[in-house]
Amino acid sequence: MKIAQYGTTIAIIHAIANGLHGLAHLEIPIPLSHLQSLFVGIVIFLIPIIAAVLLWTQFYRIGSWLLLCSMAGSILFGLYNHFIAISPDHVSQVAFEGWGLLFQVTAILILIVDGLGAGIGFWALRNIQQQEQGAL
């Protein structure tokens, strides 16, 4: 039950932070490539929602894996695009005012939230494994 609660909570916070970041992308504007948009739509938005739903069902193990993998994917995507590759999507290329302020704050917030989300996914998988070993 706690796994589902924590996983759902982090998925909601993740969606809000990424939604605000996406809004900043639109308003500045900082367009994404088609491949980036596909990744964001599937890995960053859709899969965490599916994971949160599955955590409440008999498929909670799959939900835990999806949560861990989507959060890890989101971390890698954000690290590369916002802090490594110099492009219009890099935090150093966006003014720290107006929508740029929201962009930069949410870029950092997303890393923190996704780190927590990956940690929750890992913790969930470890708990599931321990429960199954205890049942043997």
Could you tell me what each predicted segment is?
Residues 12-16, 35-58, 62, 69-76, ...:
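Core segments of alpha-helical transmembrane spans in multipass integral membrane proteins
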Residues 17-25, 69-88:
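C-terminal TM-helix exit segments that contain a strictly Trp-centered aromatic cap at the helix terminus
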Residues 54-56, 80-81, 122-126:
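Juxtamembrane cytosolic interface motif at the C-terminal end of transmembrane helices
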Residues 26-33, 60, 83-90, 125-133:
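Transmembrane helix-loop junctions in multipass membrane proteins, especially transporters and channels
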Residues 1-15, 120-130, 136:
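Cytosolic juxtamembrane helix and N-cap/initiation of the first transmembrane helix
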